[in-house]
Amino acid sequence: SDDPKESEGDLHCVCVKTTRLVRPGHITXL
């Protein structure tokens, strides 16, 4: 949607899943 908060939430989800695979000790997305 056009809601910035929704977009940030989606990106955070993807980032957390990705970083968990690459860096198990680092689960933020950023």
From Swiss-Prot:
Function: Chemokine released during platelet aggregation that plays a role in different biological processes including hematopoiesis, cell proliferation, differentiation, and activation. Acts via different functional receptors including CCR1, CXCR3A or CXCR3B. Upon interaction with CXCR3A receptor, induces activated T-lymphocytes migration mediated via downstream Ras/extracellular signal-regulated kinase (ERK) signaling. Neutralizes the anticoagulant effect of heparin by binding more strongly to heparin than to the chondroitin-4-sulfate chains of the carrier molecule.
GO cellular component terms attached to this protein's record: extracellular space
Family, per entry: Belongs to the intercrine alpha (chemokine CxC) family.
Modifications after synthesis and translation: Binds non-covalently to a proteoglycan molecule.
Keywords: Chemotaxis, Cytokine, Heparin-binding, Secreted
Oligomeric form and interacting partners: Homotetramer. Interacts with TNFAIP6 (via Link domain). Interacts with CCR1. Interacts with CXCR3.
Location relative to the cell: Secreted
Protein name: Platelet factor 4
GO biological process, alphabetically ordered: adenylate cyclase-activating G protein-coupled receptor signaling pathway; chemotaxis; positive regulation of transcription by RNA polymerase II; regulation of cell population proliferation
Gene Ontology molecular function terms on file: CXCR3 chemokine receptor binding; cytokine activity; heparin binding
Organism: Oryctolagus cuniculus
